[in-house]
């Protein structure tokens, strides 16, 4: 990604090498180290909590794992080489490194865009077509879609292997090696425009339309009431009182489920909005430079574009922690599990509500949890221990 705005063909004129300001180098190294370091740790934690926590293995979280892996690839392949470039002022990874690192950069970028598109479509089906979701929004299908996404982007990004080469610029005081193009801008500019349309414009238009439909269902449509709730005439009969209690419990559970889905949708919508905003400077620069005879390459603005990209790849775990109680609890458990002292397990009794699905592999699109309160205690209960085990069942709101 360091060659987006491009090194041109090899230069042979002996001119003094442009000196990069020291403050620019210091700011670049510090920002990239902090953002990429935190982002790498955060995305690794996302992958670990979903893989190690059974109740977190949902179709939506499966797509978030794919997004986390793609973001990791961007942070490592695009962010860290930026540090060496700032220190040495030259490409130090050789020809093979030029091909492989650039390939991984665009693979991560495009896979993250496709992962966002995938979970947007999954959310739309789950909320707007709940009957179809039982068969379409499953964990096994999500894994197949993710495999297809990575296979498609892996093949698509192979074109960079045929476009790149090492460019050597000779100056009076130094020889600078850069990872650039073996073709002129007239040939690679259409590739950038196609990339811009396929992996930015189309996903953002699709996300805008689908989240509009989702918002209409979740936030604008009236929530249907439970007809069983109107049972005041049964108060004097003990059997009818139990039915009334179960009716209220069911209605509260329904409201909790709707609230949970709203919270999940808000979180994913924030991810999409930040993706659109933080990628806009770089994508705009690419489009503008495609039509300029001399590309705009001001150092500080290029740094701003890169920092926005790194922020986009690093900020998602923070969003999950702030907006999802499940992820917050899972992150806390991952950090504290090994340090937690041995204590007597606390016993809880809660009533469980399940949706019946035909196959055990067909999970609901999110775990519809309930808050543990006295309201949900009933005659049929399940006891479990609050221990630091991977198989622990956690009840919280998304």
UniProtKB/Swiss-Prot annotation:
One Pfam family from the UniProt entry? Answer: 7tm_1
Task: Extract the PROSITE patterns matched here.
Answer: G_PROTEIN_RECEP_F1_1, G_PROTEIN_RECEP_F1_2
Supply the name of the protein: Thyrotropin-releasing hormone receptor
Q: Which organism is it from?
A: Ovis aries (Sheep)
Residues in compartment: Extracellular: 1-28, 84-99, 169-193, 289-296
Q: Tell me, in a sentence or two, what this protein's role is.
A: Receptor for thyrotropin-releasing hormone (TRH). Upon ligand binding, this G-protein-coupled receptor triggers activation of the phosphatidylinositol (IP3)-calcium-protein kinase C (PKC) pathway.
Membrane topology classification: Multi-pass membrane protein
So which residues have sugars stuck on them? 3, 10
């Amino acid at each position: 990604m360091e060659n987006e705005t491009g090194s041109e063909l090899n230069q042979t004129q002996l001119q003094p090498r442009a000196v990069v300001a020291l403050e620019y180098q210091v700011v670049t190294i510090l920002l990239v180290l902090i953002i990429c370091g935190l982002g790498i740790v955060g995305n690794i934690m996302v992958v670990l909590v979903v893989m190690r926590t059974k109740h977190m293995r949902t179709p939506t979280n499966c797509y978030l794992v794919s997004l986390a892996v793609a973001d990791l690839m961007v942070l490592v392949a695009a962010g860290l080489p930026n540090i060496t470039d700032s220190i040495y002022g030259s490409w130090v990874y050789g020809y093979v490194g030029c091909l492989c690192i650039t390939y991984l950069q665009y693979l991560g970028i495009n896979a993250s865009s496709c992962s966002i598109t995938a979970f947007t479509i999954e959310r739309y089906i789950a909320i707007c077509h709940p009957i179809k979701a039982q068969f379409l929004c499953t964990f096994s299908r999500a894994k197949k879609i993710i495999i297809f996404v990575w296979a498609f982007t892996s093949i698509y990004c192979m074109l960079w292997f045929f476009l790149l080469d090492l460019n050597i610029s000779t100056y009076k005081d130094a020889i600078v090696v850069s990872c650039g193009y073996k073709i002129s801008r007239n040939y690679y500019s259409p590739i950038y425009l196609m990339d811009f349309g396929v992996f930015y414009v189309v996903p953002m238009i699709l996300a805008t339309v689908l989240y509009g439909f989702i918002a209409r269902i979740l936030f604008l449509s009236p929530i249907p009431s439970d007809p069983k709730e109107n049972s005041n005439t049964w108060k004097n009969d003990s059997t009818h009182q139990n039915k009334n209690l179960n009716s209220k419990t069911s209605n509260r559970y329904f409201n909790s489920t709707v609230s949970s889905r709203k919270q999940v949708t808000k979180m994913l919508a924030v991810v999409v909005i930040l993706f659109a905003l933080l990628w806009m400077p770089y994508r705009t620069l690419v489009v503008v430079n495609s039509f300029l005879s001399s590309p705009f390459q001001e150092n500080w603005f290029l740094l701003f574009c890169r920092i926005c990209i790194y922020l986009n790849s690093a900020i998602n775990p923070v969003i999950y922690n702030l907006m999802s109680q499940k992820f917050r609890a899972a992150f806390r458990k991952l950090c504290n599990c090994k340090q937690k002292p041995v204590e007597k397990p606390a016993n809880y009794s809660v009533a469980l509500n399940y949706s019946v699905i035909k196959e055990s592999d067909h999970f609901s699109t999110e775990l519809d949890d309930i808050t543990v309160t006295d309201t949900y205690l009933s005659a049929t209960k399940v006891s479990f221990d609050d221990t630091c085990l991977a198989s622990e069942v956690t009840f919280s709101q998304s």
